Protein backbone atom coordinates (compact mmCIF):
# COMPACT_ATOMS: atom_id res chain seq x y z
CA UNK A 1 0.00 0.00 0.00
CA UNK A 2 1.59 3.27 -1.15
CA UNK A 3 0.45 6.06 1.16
CA UNK A 4 2.64 8.63 2.94
CA UNK A 5 0.76 8.15 6.24
CA UNK A 6 1.13 4.36 6.18
CA UNK A 7 4.76 4.54 5.07
CA UNK A 8 5.71 6.95 7.87
CA UNK A 9 3.82 4.85 10.44
CA UNK A 10 5.77 1.78 9.31
CA UNK A 11 9.07 3.63 9.60
CA UNK A 12 8.18 4.63 13.16
CA UNK A 13 7.07 1.11 14.15
CA UNK A 14 10.42 -0.28 12.95
CA UNK A 15 12.10 1.81 15.64
CA UNK A 16 11.62 -0.13 18.93
CA UNK A 17 11.05 2.91 21.14
CA UNK A 18 10.37 1.25 24.48
CA UNK A 19 9.64 4.03 26.96
CA UNK A 20 11.56 6.29 27.48
CA UNK A 21 13.90 5.30 24.62
CA UNK A 22 12.98 7.24 21.48
CA UNK A 23 15.04 4.95 19.21
CA UNK A 24 15.34 7.58 16.49
CA UNK A 25 11.64 8.29 16.00
CA UNK A 26 11.89 11.99 16.79
CA UNK A 27 14.82 12.51 14.43
CA UNK A 28 12.60 11.18 11.65
CA UNK A 29 9.73 13.50 12.57
CA UNK A 30 12.02 16.51 13.00
CA UNK A 31 13.55 15.97 9.56
CA UNK A 32 10.09 16.01 7.98
CA UNK A 33 8.99 19.12 9.90
CA UNK A 34 12.16 21.09 9.24
CA UNK A 35 11.76 20.36 5.53
CA UNK A 36 8.51 22.36 5.53
CA UNK A 37 9.82 25.31 7.50
CA UNK A 38 9.31 24.38 11.15
CA UNK A 39 11.69 25.69 13.79
CA UNK A 40 12.54 22.81 16.14
CA UNK A 41 13.69 23.10 19.75
CA UNK A 42 14.87 19.91 21.42
CA UNK A 43 13.95 19.87 25.10
CA UNK A 44 15.50 16.75 26.61
CA UNK A 45 15.30 16.04 30.33
CA UNK A 46 17.30 13.17 31.90
CA UNK A 47 16.65 10.03 29.81
CA UNK A 48 13.66 11.50 27.96
CA UNK A 49 13.71 13.13 24.54
CA UNK A 50 11.20 15.87 23.76
CA UNK A 51 10.83 18.52 21.13
CA UNK A 52 8.76 21.65 20.56
CA UNK A 53 8.38 22.73 16.94
CA UNK A 54 6.51 25.66 15.42
CA UNK A 55 5.78 27.41 12.15
CA UNK A 56 4.16 30.82 11.77
CA UNK A 57 2.97 33.16 14.49
CA UNK A 58 -0.17 34.21 16.31
CA UNK A 59 -3.02 32.04 17.52
CA UNK A 60 -1.45 28.63 18.14
CA UNK A 61 -2.69 25.12 17.41
CA UNK A 62 -0.38 22.38 18.71
CA UNK A 63 -0.46 18.68 17.96
CA UNK A 64 0.81 16.57 20.86
CA UNK A 65 1.86 12.96 21.10
CA UNK A 66 4.43 10.42 22.21
CA UNK A 67 6.94 8.27 20.34
CA UNK A 68 7.40 5.71 23.12
CA UNK A 69 5.55 2.41 23.31
CA UNK A 70 4.89 -0.25 25.94
CA UNK A 71 6.78 -3.58 25.79
CA UNK A 72 5.35 -6.03 23.25
CA UNK A 73 5.13 -8.99 25.62
CA UNK A 74 5.83 -12.46 24.22
CA UNK A 75 6.93 -11.76 20.64
CA UNK A 76 6.20 -15.37 19.69
CA UNK A 77 2.49 -14.74 20.25
CA UNK A 78 2.39 -12.00 17.61
CA UNK A 79 1.32 -12.93 14.09
CA UNK A 80 4.41 -11.03 12.96
CA UNK A 81 7.35 -9.62 14.94
CA UNK A 82 6.03 -6.60 16.87
CA UNK A 83 8.54 -4.16 15.38
CA UNK A 84 8.16 -5.38 11.81
CA UNK A 85 5.03 -3.61 10.53
CA UNK A 86 2.80 -5.84 8.44
CA UNK A 87 -0.49 -5.18 6.64
CA UNK A 88 -3.02 -8.02 6.62
CA UNK A 89 -6.58 -7.66 5.39
CA UNK A 90 -6.29 -3.89 5.55
CA UNK A 91 -5.01 -3.87 9.14
CA UNK A 92 -1.54 -2.54 9.99
CA UNK A 93 0.04 -4.65 12.75
CA UNK A 94 2.90 -3.57 15.01
CA UNK A 95 3.59 -2.23 18.48
CA UNK A 96 2.56 1.41 18.49
CA UNK A 97 0.37 1.17 15.38
CA UNK A 98 -2.60 2.54 17.33
CA UNK A 99 -0.86 4.00 20.38
CA UNK A 100 0.30 6.21 18.88
CA UNK A 101 2.69 6.11 15.95
CA UNK A 102 -0.17 6.07 13.47
CA UNK A 103 -1.43 9.36 14.91
CA UNK A 104 2.05 10.90 14.75
CA UNK A 105 2.37 9.97 11.09
CA UNK A 106 -1.09 11.36 10.36
CA UNK A 107 -0.20 14.64 12.11
CA UNK A 108 3.04 15.13 10.18
CA UNK A 109 1.55 14.26 6.79
CA UNK A 110 -1.42 16.53 7.54
CA UNK A 111 1.02 19.35 8.33
CA UNK A 112 2.91 18.73 5.08
CA UNK A 113 -0.29 18.93 3.05
CA UNK A 114 -1.54 21.95 4.98
CA UNK A 115 1.68 23.92 4.51
CA UNK A 116 1.77 23.06 0.81
CA UNK A 117 -1.72 24.53 0.40
CA UNK A 118 -1.33 27.39 2.91
CA UNK A 119 2.36 28.41 2.89
CA UNK A 120 1.48 31.76 4.47
CA UNK A 121 -1.04 30.48 7.02
CA UNK A 122 -2.40 33.07 9.43
CA UNK A 123 -1.82 31.33 12.78
CA UNK A 124 0.97 29.26 14.30
CA UNK A 125 1.12 25.48 13.92
CA UNK A 126 3.13 23.59 16.55
CA UNK A 127 4.13 20.11 17.68
CA UNK A 128 4.86 18.90 21.23
CA UNK A 129 6.36 15.40 21.15
CA UNK A 130 7.80 13.27 24.00
CA UNK A 131 9.39 9.85 24.44
CA UNK A 132 7.97 9.27 27.92
CA UNK A 133 4.21 9.04 28.17
CA UNK A 134 3.82 5.31 28.78
CA UNK A 135 6.23 5.01 31.73
CA UNK A 136 6.79 7.54 34.54
CA UNK A 137 6.01 10.62 32.40
CA UNK A 138 8.15 12.63 34.83
CA UNK A 139 10.49 14.12 32.23
CA UNK A 140 8.17 14.33 29.26
CA UNK A 141 5.29 16.63 28.41
CA UNK A 142 5.02 17.99 31.96
CA UNK A 143 8.59 19.34 31.85
CA UNK A 144 8.11 20.83 28.38
CA UNK A 145 4.90 22.53 29.53
CA UNK A 146 6.67 23.96 32.59
CA UNK A 147 9.43 25.37 30.37
CA UNK A 148 6.93 26.86 27.92
CA UNK A 149 4.89 28.41 30.72
CA UNK A 150 8.03 29.90 32.29
CA UNK A 151 8.62 31.93 29.12
CA UNK A 152 4.92 32.73 28.57
CA UNK A 153 4.66 30.67 25.40
CA UNK A 154 1.28 30.96 23.70
CA UNK A 155 -0.88 27.88 23.24
CA UNK A 156 -4.54 28.31 22.35
CA UNK A 157 -5.57 24.88 21.08
CA UNK A 158 -4.05 21.43 21.45
CA UNK A 159 -5.01 18.23 19.65
CA UNK A 160 -3.66 15.12 21.40
CA UNK A 161 -3.48 12.08 19.13
CA UNK A 162 -4.27 9.43 21.73
CA UNK A 163 -6.43 6.57 20.39
CA UNK A 164 -9.83 7.92 21.44
CA UNK A 165 -12.08 5.99 19.08
CA UNK A 166 -13.99 2.82 19.99
CA UNK A 167 -15.40 1.27 16.82
CA UNK A 168 -14.72 3.67 13.96
CA UNK A 169 -12.28 6.56 13.80
CA UNK A 170 -13.84 9.68 15.28
CA UNK A 171 -16.81 8.04 16.98
CA UNK A 172 -15.44 9.26 20.33
CA UNK A 173 -13.59 12.50 20.99
CA UNK A 174 -12.17 13.11 24.46
CA UNK A 175 -12.80 16.70 25.53
CA UNK A 176 -11.58 16.16 29.08
CA UNK A 177 -10.24 13.60 31.52
CA UNK A 178 -10.88 12.72 35.13
CA UNK A 179 -8.32 13.51 37.78
CA UNK A 180 -6.25 10.72 39.34
CA UNK A 181 -5.22 10.66 43.01
CA UNK A 182 -3.54 7.72 44.75
CA UNK A 183 -3.34 7.22 48.52
CA UNK A 184 -0.61 5.03 50.02
CA UNK A 185 -1.79 4.42 53.56
CA UNK A 186 -0.05 2.52 56.36
CA UNK A 187 -2.06 1.65 59.48
CA UNK A 188 0.18 1.05 62.49
CA UNK A 189 -0.49 -1.59 65.13
CA UNK A 190 1.62 -3.72 67.46
CA UNK A 191 3.00 -7.06 66.31
CA UNK A 192 2.49 -10.05 68.58
CA UNK A 193 1.58 -13.71 68.99
CA UNK A 194 -1.92 -14.67 67.87
CA UNK A 195 -2.37 -16.57 71.14
CA UNK A 196 -1.79 -13.36 73.11
CA UNK A 197 -3.92 -10.73 71.34
CA UNK A 198 -4.08 -8.61 74.50
CA UNK A 199 -0.34 -7.99 74.09
CA UNK A 200 -0.69 -6.85 70.47
CA UNK A 201 -2.78 -4.45 68.41
CA UNK A 202 -4.00 -5.88 65.11
CA UNK A 203 -4.01 -3.15 62.42
CA UNK A 204 -6.13 -5.29 60.09
CA UNK A 205 -8.92 -5.52 62.65
CA UNK A 206 -8.63 -1.83 63.45
CA UNK A 207 -8.72 -0.80 59.78
CA UNK A 208 -11.65 -3.00 58.75
CA UNK A 209 -14.44 -0.60 59.89
CA UNK A 210 -12.59 2.32 58.29
CA UNK A 211 -12.24 0.48 54.97
CA UNK A 212 -15.86 -0.62 55.08
CA UNK A 213 -16.97 2.98 55.48
CA UNK A 214 -14.49 4.23 52.87
CA UNK A 215 -15.78 1.95 50.10
CA UNK A 216 -19.39 2.90 50.89
CA UNK A 217 -18.88 6.64 50.34
CA UNK A 218 -20.69 8.25 47.40
CA UNK A 219 -18.16 10.95 46.56
CA UNK A 220 -20.33 12.78 44.05
CA UNK A 221 -22.87 12.10 41.34
CA UNK A 222 -20.77 13.42 38.48
CA UNK A 223 -22.18 15.97 36.07
CA UNK A 224 -23.14 16.24 32.42
CA UNK A 225 -19.49 15.84 31.37
CA UNK A 226 -18.09 13.43 33.97
CA UNK A 227 -19.23 10.15 35.52
CA UNK A 228 -19.35 9.95 39.30
CA UNK A 229 -16.02 9.86 41.10
CA UNK A 230 -14.72 6.31 41.55
CA UNK A 231 -12.57 4.97 44.40
CA UNK A 232 -10.93 1.56 44.08
CA UNK A 233 -8.66 -0.29 46.48
CA UNK A 234 -5.72 -1.55 44.42
CA UNK A 235 -3.43 -3.23 46.95
CA UNK A 236 -3.60 -4.51 50.54
CA UNK A 237 -0.62 -6.05 52.32
CA UNK A 238 -0.12 -7.23 55.88
CA UNK A 239 1.42 -10.06 57.85
CA UNK A 240 4.65 -12.03 57.88
CA UNK A 241 3.32 -15.07 56.07
CA UNK A 242 3.09 -16.97 59.34
CA UNK A 243 -0.25 -18.04 60.81
CA UNK A 244 0.78 -17.30 64.38
CA UNK A 245 1.90 -13.68 64.10
CA UNK A 246 -0.37 -10.67 64.44
CA UNK A 247 0.94 -8.12 61.91
CA UNK A 248 2.36 -4.82 63.06
CA UNK A 249 1.31 -2.86 59.99
CA UNK A 250 -1.30 -2.86 57.25
CA UNK A 251 -0.58 -1.19 53.91
CA UNK A 252 -3.52 -0.11 51.75
CA UNK A 253 -3.28 1.60 48.37
CA UNK A 254 -6.38 3.11 46.80
CA UNK A 255 -6.98 5.35 43.79
CA UNK A 256 -9.57 8.00 43.00
CA UNK A 257 -10.65 8.91 39.48
CA UNK A 258 -12.43 12.15 40.23
CA UNK A 259 -14.64 14.59 38.40
CA UNK A 260 -14.68 18.37 38.39
CA UNK A 261 -17.22 18.19 41.24
CA UNK A 262 -14.30 17.55 43.61
CA UNK A 263 -10.75 18.74 44.19
CA UNK A 264 -7.89 16.58 45.41
CA UNK A 265 -7.84 18.61 48.63
CA UNK A 266 -11.51 17.82 49.28
CA UNK A 267 -10.83 14.10 48.85
CA UNK A 268 -7.79 14.20 51.13
CA UNK A 269 -9.71 16.05 53.84
CA UNK A 270 -12.54 13.51 53.82
CA UNK A 271 -10.16 10.54 54.00
CA UNK A 272 -8.16 12.09 56.85
CA UNK A 273 -11.35 12.92 58.76
CA UNK A 274 -12.44 9.29 58.43
CA UNK A 275 -9.07 8.06 59.73
CA UNK A 276 -9.40 10.33 62.75
CA UNK A 277 -12.99 9.22 63.32
CA UNK A 278 -11.80 5.61 63.61
CA UNK A 279 -8.89 6.63 65.86
CA UNK A 280 -6.26 4.96 63.71
CA UNK A 281 -2.52 5.47 63.93
CA UNK A 282 -1.32 5.98 60.40
CA UNK A 283 1.11 7.46 57.94
CA UNK A 284 -0.14 8.58 54.56
CA UNK A 285 1.44 9.53 51.25
CA UNK A 286 -0.52 11.05 48.38
CA UNK A 287 0.31 11.04 44.67
CA UNK A 288 -1.66 13.36 42.41
CA UNK A 289 -0.96 12.29 38.83
CA UNK A 290 -3.44 14.66 37.23
CA UNK A 291 -6.20 17.16 37.86
CA UNK A 292 -9.47 16.80 35.96
CA UNK A 293 -9.85 19.06 32.96
CA UNK A 294 -12.65 19.87 30.56
CA UNK A 295 -12.77 21.66 27.22
CA UNK A 296 -16.31 22.91 26.67
CA UNK A 297 -17.84 23.53 23.26
CA UNK A 298 -15.80 26.20 21.52
CA UNK A 299 -13.55 26.69 18.52
CA UNK A 300 -11.43 23.54 19.01
CA UNK A 301 -14.26 21.14 19.87
CA UNK A 302 -16.35 22.54 17.03
CA UNK A 303 -13.46 22.18 14.56
CA UNK A 304 -12.84 18.57 15.61
CA UNK A 305 -16.53 17.65 15.42
CA UNK A 306 -16.76 19.31 12.00
CA UNK A 307 -13.74 17.36 10.71
CA UNK A 308 -15.14 14.03 11.89
CA UNK A 309 -18.59 14.72 10.47
CA UNK A 310 -17.10 15.84 7.15
CA UNK A 311 -14.92 12.78 6.56
CA UNK A 312 -16.70 9.98 8.42
CA UNK A 313 -20.30 11.22 8.35
CA UNK A 314 -20.83 10.42 12.03
CA UNK A 315 -21.47 12.68 15.01
CA UNK A 316 -18.77 11.99 17.60
CA UNK A 317 -19.54 11.49 21.26
CA UNK A 318 -17.77 13.93 23.57
CA UNK A 319 -16.53 11.86 26.52
CA UNK A 320 -14.19 12.20 29.50
CA UNK A 321 -13.92 8.50 30.35
CA UNK A 322 -10.78 6.36 30.45
CA UNK A 323 -7.40 6.88 32.05
CA UNK A 324 -5.18 9.92 32.15
CA UNK A 325 -3.24 11.38 29.21
CA UNK A 326 -0.67 14.10 28.69
CA UNK A 327 -3.59 16.42 27.98
CA UNK A 328 -3.76 16.97 31.74
CA UNK A 329 -0.40 18.76 31.65
CA UNK A 330 -1.14 20.80 28.52
CA UNK A 331 -4.46 22.02 29.96
CA UNK A 332 -2.44 23.91 32.61
CA UNK A 333 -1.42 26.38 29.90
CA UNK A 334 -5.03 27.47 29.56
CA UNK A 335 -5.33 25.82 26.17
CA UNK A 336 -8.43 24.11 24.84
CA UNK A 337 -7.44 20.41 24.73
CA UNK A 338 -9.13 17.63 22.76
CA UNK A 339 -8.07 14.06 21.99
CA UNK A 340 -8.78 12.48 18.62
CA UNK A 341 -7.08 9.33 17.41
CA UNK A 342 -7.62 5.83 16.01
CA UNK A 343 -9.60 2.91 17.42
CA UNK A 344 -8.20 1.78 20.78
CA UNK A 345 -9.42 -1.85 20.81
CA UNK A 346 -5.92 -3.39 20.61
CA UNK A 347 -3.71 -0.87 22.38
CA UNK A 348 -1.10 -2.41 24.73
CA UNK A 349 -2.18 -5.88 23.54
CA UNK A 350 -0.56 -8.70 21.60
CA UNK A 351 -1.12 -8.04 17.87
CA UNK A 352 -1.81 -4.33 18.27
CA UNK A 353 -3.21 -3.08 14.99
CA UNK A 354 -5.02 -0.24 13.28
CA UNK A 355 -7.11 -0.02 10.14
CA UNK A 356 -4.78 1.42 7.51
CA UNK A 357 -7.64 3.32 5.92
CA UNK A 358 -8.41 4.92 9.30
CA UNK A 359 -4.94 6.48 9.40
CA UNK A 360 -5.50 8.01 5.98
CA UNK A 361 -8.83 9.34 7.21
CA UNK A 362 -7.25 10.66 10.40
CA UNK A 363 -4.68 12.66 8.42
CA UNK A 364 -7.52 14.30 6.47
CA UNK A 365 -9.34 15.12 9.71
CA UNK A 366 -6.20 16.64 11.24
CA UNK A 367 -5.64 18.72 8.11
CA UNK A 368 -9.21 20.03 8.19
CA UNK A 369 -8.76 21.02 11.85
CA UNK A 370 -5.64 22.98 10.88
CA UNK A 371 -7.55 24.67 8.07
CA UNK A 372 -10.33 25.77 10.41
CA UNK A 373 -8.08 27.17 13.14
CA UNK A 374 -4.81 28.49 11.70
CA UNK A 375 -5.22 28.86 7.91
UniProtKB/Swiss-Prot annotation:
Binding site residues for Zn(2+) 1: 66, 99, 162
What EC number(s) would the UniProt record show? Answer: 3.5.1.18
What detail does the entry give on cofactor binding?
Binds 2 Zn(2+) or Co(2+) ions per subunit.
- Keywords on record: Amino-acid biosynthesis, Cobalt, Diaminopimelate biosynthesis, Hydrolase, Lysine biosynthesis, Metal-binding, Zinc
Q: Which GO terms describe its molecular function?
A: acetylornithine deacetylase activity; cobalt ion binding; succinyl-diaminopimelate desuccinylase activity; zinc ion binding
PANTHER family from the xrefs? ACETYLORNITHINE DEACETYLASE, N-ACETYL-L-CITRULLINE DEACETYLASE
Name the family. Belongs to the peptidase M20A family. DapE subfamily.
Can you name this protein?
Succinyl-diaminopimelate desuccinylase
Organism, by scientific name, is: Escherichia coli O7:K1 (strain IAI39 / ExPEC)
